[in-house]
Amino acid sequence: MAPKAEKKPASKAPAEKKPAAKKTASSTDGGKKRTKARKETYSSYIYKVLKQTHPDTGISQKAMSIMNSFVNDIFERIASEASKLAAYNKKSTISAREVQTAVRLILPGELAKHAVSEGTRAVTKYSSAQN
């Protein structure tokens, strides 16, 4: 039996990086690759808050998923209530006032007070940064 010849790697120029193809409606569009739709989550923000409050504590993927669902649910409830309040007052724009009132209606007692004060502080900080 003859000895096997050594395989040499093909000298190939490095492939150029192409910008990611956007998701298209039809897959037969000239052979373009479809990118996976991005799923937007609050994971990075939840993680930052966790590290501010408990620096030595981690969070599992399952717990992060639950927290993300929780934030989405609360956001949806507040947005829905704020939308109703704007409609009651015959306004087409949701303002900070509608959001604040929605928070007071949805969240119970002390939690609402803390949420309103933190929200007011965040809006003040944002407004001062704009000037």
Swiss-Prot record:
Annotated Gene3D superfamilies: Histone, subunit A (1.10.20.10)
Modification after translation: Monoubiquitinated by the UBC2-BRE1 complex to form H2BK123ub1. H2BK123ub1 gives a specific tag for epigenetic transcriptional activation and is also prerequisite for H3K4me and H3K79me formation. H2BK123ub1 also modulates the formation of double-strand breaks during meiosis and is a prerequisite for DNA-damage checkpoint activation. Phosphorylated by STE20 to form H2BS10ph during progression through meiotic prophase. May be correlated with chromosome condensation.
PTM sites of type N6-acetyllysine: 7-8, 12, 17
Chain spans, region Disordered: 1-38
Compositionally skewed regions (Basic and acidic residues) per UniProt: 1-19
Record-linked InterPro entries: Histone-fold, Histone_H2A/H2B/H3, Histone_H2B, HISTONE_H2B_site
GO cellular component assignments: nucleosome; nucleus; site of double-strand break
SMART domains in the record: H2B (SM00427)
Cross-link Glycyl lysine isopeptide (Lys-Gly) (interchain with G-Cter in SUMO) mapped to chain: 7-8, 17-18
General function of this protein: Core component of nucleosome. Nucleosomes wrap and compact DNA into chromatin, limiting DNA accessibility to the cellular machineries which require DNA as a template. Histones thereby play a central role in transcription regulation, DNA repair, DNA replication and chromosomal stability. DNA accessibility is regulated via a complex set of post-translational modifications of histones, also called histone code, and nucleosome remodeling.
Complex formation: The nucleosome is a histone octamer containing two molecules each of H2A, H2B, H3 and H4 assembled in one H3-H4 heterotetramer and two H2A-H2B heterodimers. The octamer wraps approximately 147 bp of DNA.
Protein name: Histone H2B
